[in-house]
């Protein structure tokens, strides 16, 4: 039982919960850009990412890692995760893969890599 309690108070659990909201925001913006504005997957993914990542950055700085949200940290986070987001979208466009596959794959990949980058580099 102690392990479950520790997990529920860990920075990863907080990061995961914020990630759920982030994912809903990202997917909603992606959908609107892709279907209503006729953006490609690359552009749709980066726009959705920027909206969601801005929310996540401030929420994670405060709740998950308990550090100040500086401009330098914000730009490092946005650049790192944004480049990854855009590359996923462009690659999946080139491979003619479904937009939903782009969203699922990027969401899973960004949860793991994003947490590691945030914990050990961006918010240290």
Curated annotation (Swiss-Prot):
Keywords: Cell membrane, Lipopolysaccharide biosynthesis, Membrane, Transmembrane, Transmembrane helix, Transport
Transmembrane portions of the chain: 12-32, 45-65, 75-95, 96-116
Family indicated by similarity: Belongs to the GtrA family.
Signal peptide as annotated in the record: none
Major location category of this protein: membrane
Domain of life: Bacteria
Gene from which the chain derives: rfbI
Function field: Involved in O antigen modification. Involved in the translocation of bactoprenol-linked glucose across the cytoplasmic membrane.
Protein name per UniProt: Bactoprenol-linked glucose translocase
UniProt cross-references to InterPro entries, sorted A to Z: Glc_translocase_bactprenl-link, GtrA_CellWall_Glycosyl, GtrA_DPMS_TM
Membrane-topology descriptor: Multi-pass membrane protein
Pathway: Bacterial outer membrane biogenesis; lipopolysaccharide biosynthesis
Claim: Endoplasmic reticulum is one of the keywords in the record: no
Cellular location(s): Cell membrane
A GO BP annotation: lipopolysaccharide biosynthetic process
Cellular component aspect of the GO annotation: plasma membrane
